[in-house]
Amino acid sequence: MKRTLIVPLVTNGNSKVFEYNQFDCIINCVDAVSSLEISKFDEIYFILNKQVAQPWRLEEKISADVTRLNHIHFSFIILPSMTDSPAETIYKALSVIGWDDRCIFIKDGDNKFALDSTPTSGNYIITSSLENLDRVDPKHKSYVKTDEQGFVTNCIEKRVISDKFIAGGYCFRTAHMFKEAYEALKNYNNTFYISDIIYWLILNKDEKFLPVEAKDFLDFNI
């Protein structure tokens, strides 16, 4: 079974993720994955949009920085147009990568965190606590609620239902399950989030997702 890391970078024209950070002049999207155990993955895909990638020569810039991460195999998928949501970005990327039984780990490009162990199988949501942040804008985050066994029972955008927010990392046991959920939700709404994908799978397919606590969470947008 392949293990694939997917890093969606530009959606709805948001290009802030490509500013150089103040720490070590590595492009933020590369810094975003640098604390993960990337050697566990068979491949890494950076997802770009043509409108931003070409004029800024992003493939060239990102490639130069990725080579510092110890000989990983990486590729770019250049989407022809902007997408309406992160979920659509992943769906279009997987249409190129393939709808199979590979495990996919989705990592947002606008933050950084470390994990005790990076999951490469099963269903997981990377979370952190509002209490761990010195500065936070709670309105712009997604939140999860868990049951007594620790499984996620609800995840929702922009509404605080617990102190646990989604830290920008998601592991799905197969790419195909993401496809099934996306196409089901697409019948009802054109714009939805990865958290909606997860909630649909919990409700309709009895999939179990476990939260994994992020360490040293850093939001590049704050």
Which stretches of residues belong to each language-model region?
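Conserved alpha/beta core of the MobA/IspD/sugar-nucleotide pyrophosphorylase nucleotidyltransferase superfamily
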Residues: 5, 163-222
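Conserved beta-loop-beta/alpha segment of the NTase-like Rossmann-fold superfamily
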Residues: 53-59, 63-146
